[in-house]
Amino acid sequence: GCTGDPARRAGNEYLFHMLASANTETFKEQGVRKVVTHCPHCLNSLKNDYPEFGATLEVIHHSELLQKLIEEGKIVPQQKAEENVVFHDSCYLGRHNEIYDAPREVLNASTTSSPIKEIEQSRETGTCCGAGGACFLLEENTGTRMSHHRLDELMVNEPDTIAVSCPFCVLMLEDAVKAKNLNVQVKDISEMLVKKN
């Protein structure tokens, strides 16, 4: 089930507490000690919020697992992509949990444009895509959408691909690409390891 992060970010502490308590109880009943997340929001919630509910988990992001498996030779990228790739740092993976290198190492192992090109607004100075704070649930009506602003920053090097490590970032940036009618792909870093047909 859901970690409850979207509820907490939207201000519904009651629902978050219900979900976190139920999930913590399930983890204890099942003897869960380690969790691999695909979503940085879930990583942040499980790692930083759940201990107040009694959860004692080792929580890692899939980029960290992929990096480890690549280093151990257990995953070998099927075909290095010949793409100009830029990486978007997810707020909850980067600035909230200081995981910057793992996704870059995965990308560097899977593209010929290694090392990937960095933009000025990356790592600690990266800009949110607009999904943080449960904003992905809202309809923005005035001003420039955050996702459009972030896309403009990411497009400075004219990439073929924008690589991300968060499913919410994928949604926000894909919507911005469609709205601006740009010819660029948005992919999760795990997709970069898979051979293209």
Where in this protein do the model-derived segments appear?
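Iron-sulfur cluster-binding electron-transfer modules in prokaryotic oxidoreductases
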Residues: 1-197
